[in-house]
Amino acid sequence: MTQSKYTIIVDPLSTGQEYPAAFKEAGQIPVAVLSGLEPPPAYTTSWHPDDFEHVHYFTGDVAALAEELRQYGPEYLVPGAESGVELCDQLTEILVPGTGNVPELASARRDKWEMAEALRVAGVPRLRQIRTADPAEAERWLKENDLLGRRLVIKPPKSAAGDEVYVVFEHGDWRERFDRVLGRTNKMGLTNDAVLIQEYAEGTEYLVDSYTVDGKHSLVDVCRYTKISRGDKIGIYHRIDFLAEDDPEVQALWPYTQQVLDAVGIRVGCGHAEVMMTADGPRLIEVAARPAGGGHQMVSELATGDNHIKRTVAHRVRGEVRDGFDLVQHLRGIFVSAYRDGYFRNREVFDGIESLKSFHWMKILHDEDAVVPETVDLFTCLAWVILIHSDAQTLDDDYHRVLEMEAAIVIDAP
């Protein structure tokens, strides 16, 4: 059990905004550390400094920030969002050395190229990829790997939630997408100083959430993803279905995912992996050392009675460790998309959705006549819907009714 009354949260943003209340309920005083003077653009609305008695800002000197934080006598630090993972690692190694994730593999838990390299070194199967800012080098690599003219994925080495992830179709112009990503500022507020080119993986994608204590990994939840593409944008979230721990799909994924967690040096805390089950077996898309975002904590708790936030507080404050999870009810989450940007004209299209037998919850993210962005990633969804029911056919029937509503959405040109 923890002795210090303070809990330091690095970037309590996105899902991490749920940490302050959870730690307060457990008797802790949450302390916020922001990895910059302002939160990254994608997380601005989730920054609530009033949730904290103490807020500290990182201005570039890790050692100086660590000295500021020593007054709290920290026994651990937790990252709240992707943007805080690296700083949290650095502060942990200074303030409570040897208690965090493997420091030498810190970049492998954040940079997708380093991630794949860590898998290669550990002998874990991975997708072929290259990180470069030089299109000539990229072309040489594509030729050497017999990938020129094949379907490819192009994305920033450091991004999240499907931001700037593009597919290049067979014999497509990969250079155009390469140039589109290189040099841009992504939604984490980082400049893309290189581009990641990856072989395209076909199969079924899964989210595998875990929690680790002293290097022993346990499952928190597992979901099957359904994602869609629009033009050359792929990985647009459309639907998730929660699976039971004893499901054969889960049993096929979990041994591989544990190898991934070991390879990138996750020794304690949350793991959030996206894994594609291909014809050649499971392959990592990416893994993160922080809680799942995008409203996932709510749906995880509904489906399993637990989530990353609760698991973290139970371990850090009370010393409780849980092995595995129980699926307590069947849940399907739906991400409603805007097919174009413009004026959202018919919010009433969702009238009557509450009468669906499996309806549980819905959040429409924009008002009538508001200008909405085209949905291209998790940040730009138009609405979220949660369906819960014991009968699979009822879930399917109601799901298709929601799709009919989505198809009837009217968005006028701006």
Could you say what each language-model-derived stretch is?
Residues M1-L105, A136, H366-T380, I388-A413:
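ATP-binding N-terminal substructure of ATP-dependent carboxylate-amine bond-forming enzymes
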Residues I94-E164:
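A conserved helix-loop-beta module that forms one wall/lid of the active-site cleft
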Residues P125-L127, L147-I154, V168-G203, K233-I236, ...:
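Conserved ATP-binding module of the ATP-grasp superfamily
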Residues P156-S159, K233, T375-T380:
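Short, flexible turn/loop "capping" segments at secondary-structure junctions
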Residues Y166, E199, D241-F242, C381-S390:
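Short, well-ordered beta-strand elements within core beta-sheets of diverse protein domains
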Residues G172, D179-R180, E199-I266, C270, ...:
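ATP-dependent carboxylate/phosphate-activation module, predominantly the ATP-grasp catalytic core
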Residues V313-P414:
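Peripheral (often C-terminal) accessory segments that flank ATP-dependent C-N-forming ligase machineries
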